[in-house]
């Protein structure tokens, strides 16, 4: 029997599980605070359990609208099995559906190879004030 994997937007009853997944590495805000600021969260379920999530925000301040990926986190026991790549593939599909141009992410140096493996390109340019890390972009191919 094929394992059950499902990616969907988060629901209210997911937030305790999402907090467990993300709180080790990210500052956590519950959904009601996030959605007011234009944030959306996707969750990845495997065999009925939420094992991963990502937080995105629409970037409309640019003349070329895109998504900003603020976090992508998978439970430690479920890493290196392709689940993060599945979440990224879902985001890429969302970009195409919404007629956006791509996905921006800022990450630590050790994560650059992971994002490059998923077709993100390192952006060379001005450093965003107050933001540490490296900026990468995935561009939708037209």
Regions found by a protein language model. Give the residues of each.
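Short amphipathic alpha-helix that is part of the acyltransferase structural core
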Residues: 1-31, 45
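A conserved beta-turn-beta hairpin within the catalytic core of GNAT-like acetyltransferases
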Residues: 59-70, 79, 129-132
